Swiss-Prot record:
Keyword Transport part of the UniProt annotation: yes
One CC-aspect GO term: mitochondrial membrane
Sequence similarity: Belongs to the mitochondrial carrier (TC 2.A.29) family.
Listed Pfam families: Mito_carr
Organism: Bos taurus
Subcellular location, record wording: Mitochondrion inner membrane
Protein name: Solute carrier family 25 member 33
Keyword Transport: yes
Function field: Mitochondrial transporter that imports/exports pyrimidine nucleotides into and from mitochondria. Selectively transports uridine, thymidine, guanosine, cytosine and inosine (deoxy)nucleoside di- and triphosphates by an antiport mechanism. May import (deoxy)nucleoside triphosphates in exchange for intramitochondrial (deoxy)nucleoside diphosphates, thus providing precursors necessary for de novo synthesis of mitochondrial DNA and RNA while exporting products of their catabolism.
GO biological process, one term: positive regulation of cell growth
Catalytic activity annotation: UTP(in) + UDP(out) = UTP(out) + UDP(in); dUTP(out) + UTP(in) = dUTP(in) + UTP(out); 5-methyl-UTP(out) + UTP(in) = 5-methyl-UTP(in) + UTP(out); 5-methyl-UDP(out) + UTP(in) = 5-methyl-UDP(in) + UTP(out)
PANTHER family, alphabetized: MITOCHONDRIAL CARRIER PROTEIN RIM2, SOLUTE CARRIER FAMILY 25 MEMBER 33
Length: 321
């Protein structure tokens, strides 16, 4: 009975710690997520730029103007949002994000912890294969449950309204999706989210390996008390940032495909069809639009989430003892 009670307390602890970590990270990095989503969208306005070229071999020596299209960068999108929509638009989608991030992180970390317990009994305990299967299982469950909320969040982030005009709130956006697309509309982009499980697996495999290395490092064993806690905390932040950065670079294209699938009235119908269409119309570089904003957002966000999670687990477990 005591063992069952202890397992229940551990699950609640991971739920609470994961929820707190996700909430803190979402608030701090919301503006960058809005910019990233705008950059990923097919509706991002391409600026036409004219480059003059002088051909000296011509009789008149006249210049020839070459036309090309340039994708706006992070700072240009930020400037456009501030000028046309106001600073509040940088926090579009924060409502559903806060509604969803705490339960999603809570479910994820609880599933991850539970799955790791199960897989430790099948494979070599705490090996990389355990972390891979645990992260993949947790991501699958979380994506399946939370996709409707993330769908609404993406729609709100893509909505463009001039400064001072009324924008849809979370409930209005959800109602509009239901009226125009039905229940299936809330699950657009889910296949891309499943493809993105590879990012989660890569991230946690690297993170757990780095965390194990930090525990065994000579510096960690030679310090004591407050100094050790501080070293561990910043070490975990660095490990989280590095693991997420590597994973994002490898698996980023699925994010662009997911955003395209969630656009209102879009021509994108399925994961494979969207990938082919984006490649044919825009080239392979389109799959990495917004990557810089993603790295700027996700690296500190993941560092905040994982470090807050580890800190709360450490403090509460230490307090319980």
């Amino acid at each position: 009975m005591a063992t069952g009670t202890q397992q229940k307390e551990n699950t609640l602890l991971h739920l609470f710690a994961g929820g707190c970590g996700g909430t803190v990270g979402a608030i701090f990095t919301c503006p960058l997520e809005v910019i990233k989503t705008r950059l990923q969208s097919s509706r991002l306005a391409l600026r036409t730029v004219y480059y003059p070229q002088v051909h000296l071999g011509t009789i008149s020596g006249a210049g020839v103007v070459r036309q090309t299209s340039v994708t706006p960068g992070l700072l240009q999108v930020l400037k456009s949002i501030l000028e046309k929509e106001g600073p509040r638009s940088l926090f579009r989608g924060l409502g559903p994000n806060l509604v969803g991030v705490a339960p999603s992180r809570a479910v994820y970390f609880a599933c991850y912890s539970k799955a790791k317990e199960q897989f430790n009994g099948v494979f070599v305990p705490n090996s990389n294969i355990v972390h891979v299967f645990s992260a993949g299982s947790a991501a699958f469950v979380t994506n399946s449950l939370m996709n409707p909320i993330w769908m609404v969040k993406t729609r709100m982030q893509l909505e463009r309204k001039v400064r001072g005009s009324k924008q849809m709130n979370t409930l209005q956006c959800a109602r509009y999706v239901y009226q125009t697309e039905g229940i299936r509309g809330f699950y657009r982009g889910l296949t891309a989210s499943y493809a993105g499980i590879s990012e989660t697996i890569i991230c946690f495999a690297i993170y757990e390996s780095l965390k194990k290395y930090l525990k065994e490092a000579p510096l960690a064993s030679s310090t004591n008390g407050t100094e050790k806690n501080s070293t561990n905390f910043f070490g975990l932040m660095a490990a989280a940032a590095l693991s997420k950065g590597c994973a994002s670079c490898v698996a980023y294209p699925h994010e662009v495909i997911r955003t395209r699938l969630r656009e209102e009235g879009s021509k994108y119908k399925s994961f494979v069809q969207t990938a082919r269409l984006v490649f044919r119309e825009e080239g392979y570089l389109a799959f990495y639009r917004g990557l810089f904003a993603q790295l700027i957002r996700q690296i500190p966000n993941t560092a905040i989430v994982l470090s807050t999670y580890e800190l709360i687990v450490y403090l509460l477990e230490d307090h319980a003892q």
